[in-house]
From Swiss-Prot:
Coiled coil: none
Organism: Lumbricus terrestris
Subcellular location field: Cytoplasm, Cytoskeleton
Reactions that this protein is recorded to catalyse: ATP + H2O = ADP + phosphate + H(+)
Molecular function GO labels: ATP binding; hydrolase activity
Protein name, UniProt field: Actin-2
Gene3D superfamilies: 3.30.420.40, Actin, Chain A, domain 4
Gene responsible for this protein: ACT2
UniProt keyword list: ATP-binding, Cytoplasm, Cytoskeleton, Hydrolase, Nucleotide-binding
Length: 376
């Protein structure tokens, strides 16, 4: 089989959403929730040809009769049976390809346990008969997508946030920090503070509404105290939002109180430091000679970095922590919600990358541990 003629598949499995498509494309073809649902009661839908499981949007729309599970928690796969269902759905239903005909590039969280990388490799070759595969670290792909090979990536999605310093294309594992504060926590926090205003959001269906409010109306304040004063003095920051049933709600200081939790985890009752300090701590764990390059190339990535105002606030906070004369640059590409996938698309279509694939033959000779020798 001539590899050149066949487009590689790129699959970015996030805690919240799975992004999938073809190498060389500029955006993923398929984006769907990383969920698997199973019927709560057998045989409720008699004659409906009821399936034993549903994946993605279909699971989401039938959630009333299903028990929903997220097989990826905090960026790490915890349920392999469900993960296999998500991959099956990706290949056969979303991309409509035969996985045995295409090389596949998968992404993994930073500090993904070795056993997990081996399991991913094994499933691709043994269950899906992939001709070739590769596993790449998510944050590294985001950095490539921004046209860099050195920098620090703040990657924040639905389930986890990481700060990943990268030098000449290699992540520096000793300096990677993980923060279990991400999009899902912000949605939960917004549900909580909207309840204090007298609106009740409790069910999973209502959580989706709150997530939409968060994505459409929230922003990061440059100066939190000052913004709070502005909000209490006038209604200039208030916005209205129409719920699916036609009811209109008003949201004021919640708009910036919600994402402020990223800088003050104590809002969520968490002990950890905010994203700015985590980024700084990550830089400080690196060799003193490369810090300058990291400060000047701080790249934001992932859906939870999409809040308006976040780059300016990061610039302000990191400047306050860094040495006085240090040049600090925060890069926030407009497409950063999908930059991991885009980086994968770029990498998998490079002519120089074609020798990097793990082939089925290499897997058959060496077994799953081949992944540690070829993907780093």
């Amino acid at each position: 089989m001539a590899e050149e003629d066949v487009a590689a598949l790129v699959v970015d499995n996030g805690s919240g959403m799975c992004k999938a498509g073809f190498a060389g494309d500029d955006a993923p073809r398929a984006v769907f929730p990383s969920i698997v649902g199973r019927p709560r009661h057998q045989g409720v839908m008699v004659g409906m040809g009821q399936k034993d499981s549903y994946v993605g949007d279909e699971a989401q729309s039938k959630r009333g009769i299903l028990t929903l599970k997220y097989p990826i928690e905090h960026g790490i796969v915890t349920n392999w049976d469900d993960m296999e269902k998500i991959w099956h759905h990706t290949f056969y239903n979303e991309l409509r390809v035969a996985p045995e005909e295409h090389p596949v590039l998968l992404t993994e969280a930073p500090l993904n346990p070795k056993a997990n990388r081996e399991k991913m490799t094994q499933i691709m070759f043994e269950t899906f008969n992939s001709p070739a595969m590769y596993v790449a670290i998510q944050a590294v792909l985001s950095l490539y997508a921004s046209g860099r090979t050195t920098g620090i990536v703040l990657d924040s999605g639905d389930g986890v946030t990481h700060t990943v310093p990268i030098y000449e294309g290699y992540a520096l594992p000793h300096a990677i920090l993980r923060l279990d504060l991400a999009g899902r926590d912000l949605t939960d926090y917004l549900m909580k503070i909207l309840t204090e205003r007298g609106y009740s959001f409790t069910t999973t269906a209502e959580r989706e509404i709150v997530r939409d409010i968060k994505e459409k109306l929230c922003y990061v304040a440059l100066d939190f105290e000052q913004e709070m004063n502005t909000a209490s003095a006038s209604s200039s920051l208030e916005k209205s939002y129409e719920l699916p049933d036609g009811q209109v709600i008003t949201i004021g200081n919640e708009r910036f109180r919600c994402p402020e939790a990223m800088f003050h985890a104590s809002f969520l009752g968490m002990e950890s430091v905010g994203i700015h300090e985590t980024t700084y701590n990550s830089i400080m764990k690196c060799d003193v000679d490369i810090r300058k390059d990291l400060y000047a190339n701080t790249v934001l990535s992932g859906g939870t970095t999409m809040f308006p105002g976040i780059a300016d606030r990061m610039q302000k906070e990191i400047t306050a922590l860094a040495p006085p004369t240090m040049k600090i640059k925060i890069i926030a590409p407009p497409e950063r919600k999908y930059s991991v996938w885009i980086g994968g698309s770029i990498l998998a279509s490079l002519s120089t990358f074609q020798q990097m694939w793990i082939s089925k033959q290499e897997y058959d000779e060496s077994g799953p541990s081949i992944v540690h020798r070829k993907c780093f």
